[in-house]
Amino acid sequence: MKSLKTLLTALIIVASSAVLSTPAFAQYPPEQAIDLTVAKVQSAIDALKSGANADAVSDLIKDALDASKEINASDTVFVARTKGSNTLKNARKHLKEGSTKDAEQELDNALKAFSNLKKLL
């Protein structure tokens, strides 16, 4: 009887954790989250090209990083999203070092990476 209670408790825990998956908590569907992230990366690129200061561009990149966290579809998309996020982090690092040309190149790479995520859905 005691082992039956333990087994039932374990099954209830497994069932409840399966119901509460991370896509259920996502604020946007994956396609919309990708579009939002691409738009934010593009706004960071536009700001950098227009001569905005590094802090303002860094804040825009941070917004794009935050938006990218909403992209949640599959393991393949997660890996590709992580690569794009790492590219954005590199762009912020280059901005802090004062290398706007390298930051712009990283932002272009991030834009391509996030744009290609829709093909993985």
Model-derived segments and spans:
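Long, charged/polar, soluble alpha-helical segments
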Residues: 2-6, 18-121
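Sec-dependent N-terminal signal peptides
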Residues: 5-13
